[in-house]
Every structure is written in structure tokens, then in C-alpha cells.
Design a protein with these regions (language model features):
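N-terminal alpha-helical interaction blocks
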Residues: 1-122, 313
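N-terminal strand-loop-strand
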Residues: 161-204, 209, 231, 255-257
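Short Pro/Gly-enriched beta-strand edge/turn motifs at strand-loop
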Residues: 56-60, 161-166, 235
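Cys/His-rich short segments
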Residues: 131-184
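A generic structural signal for well-ordered coil/turn residues at beta-strand boundaries
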Residues: 142, 177, 186, 199, ...
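Short glycine/proline-enriched turns and hinge-like loops at secondary-structure junctions
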Residues: 158, 175-176, 204, 247-248, ...
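Unchanged
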Residues: 67-121, 210-298, 303-307, 314
Length: 314
């Protein structure tokens, strides 16, 4: 992935230290280590703070004593870079807090921030920590019971799996792959779509989940035909990033109209996509003030900027 195709949530400066997850004394060692820091999370949001010399806020990692109780603890790993007061090698534990515990840590709700709003401006370390933490927290929130028998499950491996002691089923964090594509025609125009529930001037590239038994390339061809009514070829992988809402992996591609098919008319499916349209670079630039495009934290925006030849907003 080139620097020109910037994916904020693909960044990471974390050694996940997975070999320690099976250590039965893992958290005893972490709590006795004075370097250990806690990433507090409440309702999918974390604490940020301003740091002198840095234009963007940074994650506010807490001392162990500052977070006495939590609904969930997960060992995220060790940092691999120095940042602020935390040297490389700092162990970080996610602590998911209930409302009362979150209020005790930080009562001002305006100091808790979500990943969608802040992810594009975070450092490599912080983007990796926040993305990883939110994805694993969402997994635990939706997998509290065994999928086979319905009995409650318990957390194992430092927070990285759940086990049902009724039938011994072990469940690992779920990741749902989805393709997202910038389709270009022979004139160099990009294909964008708009959902019926969106504002009329909101546009994005087309995307969809990969189905069972389906390759990524096949998913690209199928989704574009289903949502826009056109056939594509020359499918090329560009990059991927986590999208932990709740636990997707967005896999980005480019594709071109299939020249073997001949003239093709755009036909939105009118279920997910209400309208589709070809945009030239000149049209995007001329209409930019009135267009709502995906936020910079998303791979959708990265695909559009990549096609445009740089940041559309300069």
C-alpha cells in the first residue's frame, strides 16, 4: 500500500504479544508492572487529551489505579514506539466500563470520543490501539452466549476468546469481510452511489459483504452488478482496513467496466442504492461544495481520493 493510498485505521504500532495470552498469570504480571497502562472505553468511546507540540489529540492512557473496576479487560499488547510519557514496550490493557465506572474516571461526557470522529487524526500507535480495542469490545458485546447451545460463555486468553463450558465450544473474535470498489469507465470517471436513507447529495463508492464460499474478486463483480447493473473486470486490490462497526474488514479494490460486454446502462437496485452516477474529476471539483463525501477515516474516502489523484479537499 502506497503513501498515496492512506488508510488511517490500517495503522498500528502495537506488538499484540499473542504468546502471552495463554499465560494463566498474565494479568497478575500486568498489574504488577509499573509500566502497564489502561485504555478506558465507555459505549465505544475513549479519552483523548491535548499534548504540547502535537496538533492532534492523543489517547489518554491511565494508570492501573485510576480504573479500579471494569466490565471487561483485554490485553491489547505492547507499544512499539515512544509516545509522550509512554516508552516503546508499554503494555496496554483495554478496560470496558459501565456508566458508573466511566463517570468515576471522567464525568464530562464531552471528553469521551468515538473512532469515526477522531480516527483520521490519530497517531499510528493510537489508531491501532483504538481500532483494535473497539473491534474486540464489540465482539464480546455480541458473543456472550454459545452459538451451539445458548449457554453463557466465559472469557479466556487474555480477552481474545470465549469458551462455553457446557459443550467446550471456543469462539474467537469475528471479522466480517466486505469489498469496497472504485469503478472507473473508459473516460476515467468514477462510479458513485447514494442510498435512499441518505441526504440527496451524499455519495460514496459501492460496497458489500462477501458471501459464504465466495472469493473477494467474485464479490466485487457480483456487488457492482447487483447495485449498479453493470459488469466489471480488471479487479485490482489496493488495500484494507478494519471497520469496527461492529467488526468488519473493508477490502478496497479498483475495477473497470468490462469492455467485452459493450455499452452498459446504469441501473440502481432501488433496494440498497437509490441512484448511481458517473463523476468526472472536473465535476467533483466543481460540485464539491454541495457534495457530501465519505469522511477521511474511511477507506471509501481513500478510494475516491486515490482516483482523484490526491486529497479532494487539498
Amino acid at each position: 500500500m502506497s503513501d498515496a493510498f492512506n488508510l488511517p485505521l490500517a495503522q498500528s504500532a502495537i506488538d499484540r504479544d499473542y504468546l502471552q495470552r495463554d499465560n494463566p498469570e498474565l494479568f497478575d504480571h500486568l498489574w504488577s508492572n509499573p509500566l502497564t497502562r489502561v485504555l478506558a472505553m465507555s459505549e465505544g468511546k475513549v479519552l483523548l487529551h491535548e499534548v504540547a507540540g502535537h496538533a492532534e489529540p492523543q489517547l489518554r492512557l491511565l494508570d492501573i489505579e485510576a480504573v479500579p473496576s471494569a466490565q471487561l479487560r483485554v490485553y491489547l499488547g505492547k507499544t512499539t514506539v515512544d509516545q509522550g510519557d509512554e516508552p516503546a514496550g508499554t503494555p496496554v490493557v483495554l478496560a470496558v466500563l459501565g456508566k458508573n465506572s466511566a463517570d468515576a474516571v471522567e464525568p464530562n461526557v464531552e471528553n469521551w470520543h468515538g473512532l469515526r470522529a477522531t480516527g483520521a487524526g490519530l497517531s499510528e500507535r493510537d489508531a491501532g490501539l483504538f481500532t483494535q480495542a473497539l473491534a474486540i469490545a464489540n465482539f464480546h458485546e455480541t458473543h456472550k452466549h454459545c452459538a451451539k447451545c445458548g449457554m453463557p460463555t466465559v472469557i479466556e486468553q487474555g480477552g481474545w476468546s470465549r469458551r462455553c463450558f457446557n459443550d467446550q465450544t471456543q469462539t474467537f473474535p469475528r471479522t466480517d469481510p466486505a469489498i469496497i470498489v472504485s469503478v472507473v469507465d473508459d473516460e476515467g470517471r468514477i462510479l458513485l452511489g447514494s442510498q435512499g436513507k441518505w441526504e440527496s447529495n451524499r455519495w460514496s463508492v459501492l460496497a458489500g459483504f462477501v458471501e459464504a464460499g465466495e472469493s473477494l474478486t467474485a464479490a466485487v463483480i457480483r456487488e457492482i452488478y447487483e447495485e449498479a447493473g453493470v459488469r466489471v473486470s480488471d479487479v485490482q486490490y489496493l488495500g484494507s482496513q478494519s471497520w469496527p462497526f461492529p467488526y468488519s474488514l473493508m477490502v478496497g479494490f479498483t475495477a473497470r467496466l468490462d469492455p467485452a460486454v459493450g455499452a452498459q446502462e446504469l441501473k440502481p437496485d432501488l433496494v440498497e442504492i437509490e441512484k448511481v452516477r458517473w463523476f468526472s474529476r472536473e465535476e467533483i471539483a466543481a460540485e464539491r461544495a454541495n457534495l457530501i463525501l465519505p469522511p477521511k477515516v474511511s477507506i471509501a474516502r481513500a478510494l475516491i481520493d486515490h482516483w482523484f489523484g490526491g486529497d479532494i479537499d487539498g
